[in-house]
Design a protein with these regions (language model features):
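A glycine-biased, small/acidic residue-tolerant capping/turn segment at secondary-structure junctions
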Residues: 88-95, 151-153
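Short beta-strand/loop turn elements enriched in aromatics
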Residues: 95-123
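A short glycine-/small-residue-rich loop at the edge of a beta-strand within enzyme catalytic domains
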Residues: 35-38, 42-49, 62-70, 103, ...
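Extended C-terminal subregions enriched in glycine
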Residues: 47-90
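Charged, cofactor-coupling segments
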Residues: 14-56, 112-185
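Short glycine/threonine-rich loop-to-helix capping motif typified by GTGT followed
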Residues: 5, 82-86, 124-125
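Active/binding-pocket-proximal capping segment
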Residues: 73-80, 92-96, 134-136, 174
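Single conserved hydrophobic/aromatic residue that forms the stacking wall/gate
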Residues: 1-11
Length: 185
């Protein structure tokens, strides 16, 4: 029993796993957040689902002609919407925010994507237009220090000519139910 051993608080936590692999001189990158107990708390589920929503909406923006800068600009609005739903931001504060210091950055302080290829964080200009056959990550996160946890999810995508990108990690579990099932099997 983890509580009787003084580990009750640890039992409520999550583990954020950011891993990569190399094959044929090319790199990969993936992040998942999993509950130590095998079950997410109700609050963790809400935050996890918000991060997954941001990832899924951002995926639709990873298309030919956009740039990483475009993705970062658009994800600010998507993230802000989710943070309002979670009660972390208030609409009245958003209306008065400094555009050079958006409020969502308190909870999501890194970029949404990076190039991937010969290196995990491969070299590439954020202004360069995205072209078919380029490979990028999408990695939103929400980090809530006051609540003692955060969630980040990351997959790798191949940009296509005339369609949405291909998630190269689509067979790796990411949905809440999938993660809990694996953790409890």
């Amino acid at each position: 029993d983890m509580v009787s051993r003084g580990l009750g608080d640890v039992y409520k936590r999550q583990i954020l796993i950011d891993v990569g692999a190399e094959y044929g001189n090319y790199s990969s990158d993936m992040t998942r957040t999993i509950p130590v107990s095998g079950k997410f708390s109700s609050r963790q589920k809400l935050v996890y689902q918000s991060v997954l929503n941001v990832k899924n909406k951002t995926e639709k923006l990873l298309i030919k002609g956009n740039s990483i800068r475009d993705l970062n600009s658009n994800v600010g609005e998507i993230m802000t919407e989710e943070l309002v739903k979670l009660g972390l931001l208030k609409i009245k504060d958003i209306k008065n925010q400094n555009p050079k210091a958006p409020l969502y950055k308190k909870y999501f302080m890194h970029g949404i994507s990076h190039h991937i290829g010969l290196d995990t964080h491969d070299y590439g200009f954020i202004e360069k237009k995205i072209e078919p056959n380029m490979v990028f990550t999408i990695e939103p996160g929400i980090y809530i220090p006051d609540e003692g946890f955060g969630v980040r999810l990351e997959d790798v995508y191949l940009v296509n000519q005339n369609s949405l990108p291909t998630n190269l990690m689509k067979s790796i579990p990411i949905e809440i139910e999938e993660i809990e099932e694996i953790m409890n099997s």
